[in-house]
């Protein structure tokens, strides 16, 4: 990997004022950007989405970058393309990328038991000490954590006050914030360097992501979004003073597009590392990813080979393998999907609890995506699916 290649995505996006007058959808249909803008505004208005930022990439170039609605509804402050938005679980693909960059540097190994990188026994760290009672903890590797198969729960608080494994490592998919946060802790502990500093060095600064951080920076105060519930009530701002591997990223859709372009163009990691990230590691066999249905056994997604790689989910479509990730937190809902064979991607970020209700429409109207398995992570079902 050569450093000067890292400038490619940035150079492309610096020209984002030259937006296309038409958007080409996955199936080849063309939609005028003026028409798309009107359609998206209608979806935002009727869906009561407080604020929405949309970036569409075709052939590794930004062809659409626009915002709708408000960053702060109570103050009637409009969202703009430089408004930073709390990105929640969008952090996870970035955490996975950052870790693989450190693997490329020879600092970490993907399949070495993670406890080897701790400077002290696990029971000496108050937040993680209960893992000492888990006989399978010594078997957990970074690969398992990044593919959500470590056996750690999504959040310990669903199971009590302490952290314990809920499955045998490598045997079952359980989406886990705890796992990603633990991996972030290990990186900081072993390297004696903060995650945000690593991200600045390896991702943000090389790609010119000036509106991004894994922690809250003072400059974000000038133009930031506030989270809102389904009724439009303010839920405040997510100010994270410390980085979390599972979800502390603050960014814009334009900045995140720079990251995705560089990642899928093999400009951030070695080809071997990217292949490992995108390769299906564990099949999704549950009807839902969250809530009581996460323990169900279902063949609902067998036909599309829905699976998780390292920090990124994948599924089959008529246009080849596609990749995706989302964010769901009170007041914040976001989603991105990438179609590498079509060189197409869309990033949607909102400060509203109402985004997911309109997600099917938004994906279909932006790039003609009617294939993403959104129902796995939300109770909103697709009314009609075009095949």
Residue ranges and their predicted role:
Residues 48, 78-79, 109, 133-140, ...:
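Extracellular/periplasmic catalytic domains that process cell-envelope and extracellular macromolecules
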Residues 1-26:
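Bacterial Sec-dependent N-terminal signal peptides
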Residues 59-61, 71-73, 150-151, 219, ...:
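Solvent-exposed coil/turn segments that connect beta secondary-structure elements
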Residues 153-157, 211-222:
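Proline-centered turn/helix-capping motifs that create local helix->coil transitions or kinks
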């Amino acid at each position: 990997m050569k450093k000067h290649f890292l400038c490619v995505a940035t150079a492309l996006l610096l020209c984002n004022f030259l937006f296309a007058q038409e958007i080409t959808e996955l199936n080849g249909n063309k939609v005028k950007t003026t028409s798309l803008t009107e359609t998206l505004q209608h979806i935002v208005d009727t869906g009561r989405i407080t604020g929405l930022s949309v970036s569409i990439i075709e052939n590794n170039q930004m062809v659409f970058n626009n915002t709708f609605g408000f960053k702060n509804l109570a103050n009637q402050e409009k969202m703009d393309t430089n408004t930073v938005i709390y990105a929640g679980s969008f952090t996870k693909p970035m955490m996975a990328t950052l870790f693989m960059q450190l693997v490329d540097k020879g600092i970490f190994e993907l399949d070495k038991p993670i406890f080897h990188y701790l400077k002290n026994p696990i029971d000496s760290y108050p937040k993680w000490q209960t893992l000492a009672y888990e006989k399978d903890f010594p078997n957990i590797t970074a690969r398992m954590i990044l593919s959500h198969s470590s056996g750690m729960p999504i959040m310990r608080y669903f199971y009590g006050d302490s952290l314990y494994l809920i499955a045998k490592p490598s045997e079952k998919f359980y989406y886990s914030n705890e796992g990603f946060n633990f991996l972030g802790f290990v990186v900081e502990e072993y390297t004696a360097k903060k995650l945000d500093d690593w991200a600045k060095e390896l991702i943000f600064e090389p790609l010119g992501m000036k509106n991004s951080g894994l922690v809250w920076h003072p400059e974000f105060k000038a133009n930031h979004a506030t989270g809102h519930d389904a009724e439009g009530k303010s839920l405040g701002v997510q100010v994270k003073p410390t980085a979390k591997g599972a979800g502390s990223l603050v960014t814009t859709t334009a900045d995140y597009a720079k990251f995705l372009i560089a990642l899928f163009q093999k400009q951030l990691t070695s080809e071997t590392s990217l292949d490992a990230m995108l390769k299906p590691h564990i099949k999704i066999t549950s009807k839902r990813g969250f809530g009581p249905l996460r323990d169900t056994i279902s063949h609902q997604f067998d036909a599309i080979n829905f699976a998780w790689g390292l920090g990124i989910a994948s599924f089959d479509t008529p246009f080849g393998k596609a990749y995706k990730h989302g964010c769901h937190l009170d007041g914040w809902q976001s989603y991105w999907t990438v179609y590498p064979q079509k060189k197409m991607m869309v990033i949607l970020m909102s400060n509203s609890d109402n985004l997911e209700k309109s997600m099917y429409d938004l994906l279909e109207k932006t790039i003609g995506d009617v294939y993403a398995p959104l129902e796995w992570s939300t109770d909103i079902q697709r009314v009609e699916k075009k095949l």
